Design a protein with these regions (language model features):
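Extracytoplasmic beta-strand/coil segments of soluble accessory domains associated
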Residues: 147-191, 215, 226-242
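Gram-negative outer-membrane beta-barrel transporters
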Residues: 606, 628-726
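Short, acidic, small-residue-rich periplasmic hinge/interaction motif at the N-terminus
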Residues: 28-31, 38-43, 73-78, 87, ...
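Outer-membrane beta-barrel transmembrane domain signature of Gram-negative proteins
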Residues: 262-276, 363-382, 416-503, 547, ...
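Short acidic/polar hinge/loop motifs at secondary-structure boundaries
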Residues: 57-60, 191-220
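Conserved C-terminal beta-signal and adjacent last beta-strands/turns
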Residues: 280, 294, 319, 540-541, ...
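Outer membrane beta-barrel strand-and-loop segments of large Gram-negative receptors
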Residues: 424-430, 477, 483, 491, ...
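Flexible loop and strand-edge segments within Gram-negative outer membrane beta-barrel domains
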Residues: 298-307, 311-386, 393, 397-426, ...
Length: 810
């Protein structure tokens, strides 16, 4: 089927327009400020434009002789529509004044079904983080975006600058063990990023300059992510980067920042620096571009061999319109380097405080000499062709690669190395068709095919590693690991709408997975959804319900196959089964006037055959920890999610609150074993999952200095609450290993269970434009300097982190 795509793609049904007419104007808010990036479209056509930095737009070559409806749309504002009629050669001026509004039912969402669809038709809750919000929230990683912004999102605090938070989950995730993002699939401009399935960490801090992000869509839960297939059980994050400027004027931006971070382990403060530059513009009416670079240097917050964390990121975008087709080509390149750290050195403090006289001698060994370097290139091509206003096709081709080199030098001058090459290539083709019927019924159909091919090649030399015939090819002084997986998915979704009020969704994905040479067969994932819009006075409500049985999560190579590192040994488990899930959710969205929004969702999800790290087989007397991965029975996640937005003059209030009841279901293996008593009993709460999370964000808009400089700024305070959670008392656990008068505890001993108290972290952010070209900003994270050791005492959180910087725009 794929071989016909090139021929199919360059068939065009668009006719050559006459000179036609031109529509131009300016889009402003209620204060007369220009709205950059607003979309102005002619309804029921493929014609439209986005406003430039001054709010100006222009639409050329508009066929004349018939009436049109011209609509202006901007996130956070009411859509404005007016009727127009053009004559041949006429230049029609249409200005818009847009009123702020939290009513976002007509906002276009892409993440749920790949194609563009209004939020009113979505049966699952979607969180959209706009460019305006991102400017208030300097981000360093994926979870920095989600934490506090998305109901049901939770992560432990990070322990190194710019690093992903540990074990991020949405709605409790699946196993939550060893999965950096808890089965959240991440896309950048439609291209799937490397993830846990190929042993890679998909943090956007590695390659994306935060100032290059246009908006982010977050779709939580397996009911909404069904069409995306395997490894998306907890949800979808779709990041959209910026296109070129809508204006012929070239816009240059520069950011300079200095970071000061409290390092509790070093008992000192460490310094970091960041510089970024971007350039955007438009060479012709149909071609625009965007280029940028970002450079960061951070001192280590852990005992190290003296090397800093260095990162250089470049990005570029070229956007073109050719007749009825749009082409977006984007690339990102990043280079990074850092030294080695010790995760054990600071345990000497506990050794003294708790009398660990049997502690190993190697805890205070000097950190080895060497470094870790990586190069991460990426590429995406989006081709969309409109056959008519209600029918278009899209082809997305992309690649995400990460190459790393681990180099270690011995005291004798010898060198060992580990070279890792991760690669993922994505191709996604779909078409989207809307058909209106005379009886006010509309049919909206999307169908497509998605192919993902991933690989993980590891070449190591003079490194002591265990060998396995399924895992390694041996050479004289090196070993080669070649793992690959592929996913082929066919998907379709139909939405039947009535009077723009009621929407019924039917969707299904059929996919085939092959991981490291093993065929996991064919899997079918259906979904159903219903949404209904109603009005009562100034109250608008949207009732919604969804059910889905999402894609499987096949075991990863690092779980099923043996491996060995400097610290631990995975004995492997080739009999692992894929994870599976299904669930439903019901809820509603409520809008009171333009300034109040409430979202309520109840969900019930069942996970089967979850895969989890099990170190119970470890012999404490050996230097390296031994572990393997096993399947357990059921996880039942139930809960409530609430989100509130409101506005009082210059004050915006955003709040989320989530109640999560995550418990073990039936497990025929471990529930009959007394060694696991208290951990996996049916109905027992899971470890490391908080009972509740909440966020309160207060953002105050500051007025501009004068009538010539109206940009102003904002002051934001964030309060993040993490509720009680069950976990291990790690200090007591290690007492059993290293304290001679304490009997050792097994890893799953109920005697080491403890309930960690709730805590609150505070973040303060602010920015202000002193001129139209110069702004200063401040970001203070973890003001309370909270340290969380609930998951591990070898990697505690950072202390307070303060960032001060300047923004320049010309």
């Amino acid at each position: 089927m794929i071989k016909f795509f090139p021929l199919f793609f360059f068939i065009t049904s668009s006719a050559l327009f006459s000179q036609g007419g031109t529509i131009s104007g300016v889009v402003q808010d209620e204060k007369g400020e220009p709205l950059a990036g607003a979309n102005v479209i002619l309804k029921n056509t493929v014609l439209g434009a986005a406003t430039d930095d001054q709010g100006n737009y222009i639409i050329r070559k508009v066929p004349v002789g018939k009436p049109y409806q011209l609509s202006a749309m901007y996130i956070g504002h009411r859509t404005v529509t007016r009727d127009i009629h053009l004559q041949e050669g006429e230049i029609f001026t249409a200005d818009f004044i847009m009123k702020q509004s939290l009513i976002d039912l007509d906002e276009i969402i892409v993440s749920a079904s790949f194609s563009k669809r209004k939020k009113r038709a979505q049966a699952s809750p979607v969180t959209v983080i706009s460019e305006d919000e991102l400017r208030r929230l300097p981000i360093r990683s994926v979870d920095d975006i989600l934490l506090g912004k998305v109901p049901g999102g939770y992560a432990n605090l990070p322990h190194r600058p710019g690093q992903n938070n540990s074990a991020f989950t949405l709605r409790g995730g699946t196993s939550g063990s060893g999965r950096p993002l808890g089965d959240v699939k991440i896309y950048v401009d439609g291209v799937e990023l490397l993830g846990f399935d190929v042993q890679a960490y998909p943090g956007i801090a590695d390659f994306i300059d935060p100032s290059d992000i246009e908006k982010i869509e977050v779709l939580r839960g397996p009911m909404g992510s069904t069409l995306h297939g395997s490894n998306a059980q907890s949800g979808i994050i779709h990041i959209f980067t910026k296109r070129g400027s809508s204006s012929r004027k070239t816009v240059m931006r520069m950011k300079i920042a200095r970071k000061n971070t409290v390092a509790p382990i070093l008992n000192d403060d460490v310094i970091g620096h960041e510089v970024s530059f971007s350039l955007s513009g438009r060479s012709t009416s149909d071609i625009s571009y965007n280029l940028g670079a970002n450079r960061t240097v951070d001192e280590e917050v852990m005992p190290s061999n003296g090397k800093n964390i260095e990162l250089l990121k470049l990005h570029g975008a070229l956007n073109a319109r050719i007749g009825s087709a749009k082409i977006d080509i984007k690339t990102f390149q990043s280079w990074g380097k850092q030294g080695f750290i010790s995760n054990l050195f600071h345990l000497l403090k506990y050794q003294e405080e708790r009398g660990w006289t049997d502690a190993p001698d190697h805890w205070d060994d000097p950190v080895s000499d060497g470094s870790i370097e990586y190069y991460k290139p990426g590429f995406s091509l989006n081709f969309t062709q409109n056959f008519n206003p209600n029918w278009y096709q899209t082809l997305i081709i992309g690649n995400d690669t990460r190459q790393s080199l681990y180099r270690k030098f011995g005291s004798d001058g010898g060198e060992s190395y580990l070279k890792h090459d991760w690669n993922r290539t994505t191709m996604n083709y779909f078409w989207h068709l809307k058909k209106k019927f005379p009886n006010l019924v509309e049919l909206d159909v999307t169908a497509g095919v998605q192919r993902t091919q991933s690989s993980n090649v590891r070449l190591s030399g003079t490194v002591d590693e265990a060998k396995d015939q399924y895992y390694y090819d041996d050479f004289e002084d090196a070993s080669l690991v070649d793992q690959s997986n592929s996913n082929m998915g066919y998907y379709a979704e139909a939405v039947l709408g009535y009077q723009e009020r009621m929407f019924l969704t039917f969707g299904e994905r059929m996919e085939e997975n092959e991981y490291f040479g093993r065929d996991y067969g064919r899997h079918i994932s259906p979904r159903l959804g219903l949404s209904y819009i109603w009005e009562l006075g100034n109250l608008i409500g949207k009732a919604r319900a969804a059910w889905g049985s999402g894609g499987i999560n096949p075991p990863q190579a690092m779980q099923a196959l043996p491996s060995e590192s400097s610290y631990n040994i995975n004995i492997g488990n080739p009999d692992l089964r894929p994870e599976r899930q299904s669930g439903y959710e019901v809820g509603g969205d409520f809008y009171i006037g333009d300034n109040f929004f409430l979202e309520v969702t109840y969900f019930d999800q069942l996970f089967l055959d979850g895969i989890q790290n099990d170190p119970s087989i470890d012999d404490p007397g050996t230097l390296k920890q031994e572990y393997w991965y096993i399947n357990f029975g059921e996880i039942i996640n139930k809960g409530w999610e609430f989100a509130v937005k409101t506005r009082f003059g210059p004050l915006d209030i955003n709040a989320t609150y989530s109640i999560l009841d995550s418990r073990w279901g039936q497990d025929s293996i471990r529930q009959n074993d007394p060694d696991y008593e208290g951990f996996f009993d049916e109905g027992v709460r899971r470890n490391d999952v908080p009972t509740s999370t909440a966020n309160l964000s207060l953002a105050y808009s500051l007025p501009g200095i004068s009538s010539k400089n109206r940009k102003g700024g904002s002051l934001v305070i964030d309060l993040n609450y993490t509720g009680e959670k069950k976990g291990r008392d790690w200090l007591k656990y290690y007492d059993g290993f290293y304290k001679p008068d304490v009997e050792p505890f097994s890893y799953y001993s109920k005697d080491v269970l403890v309930y960690y108290k709730p805590y609150v972290t505070v973040r303060l952010r602010g920015n202000y434009w002193f001129t139209n070209n110069l702004a200063a900003y401040l970001d203070i994270r973890n003001l309370t300097e909270h340290e969380d050791i609930s998951r591990s005492i070898t990697q505690p959180a950072l202390g307070r982190q303060m960032i001060i910087g300047l923004d320049l725009e010309f």
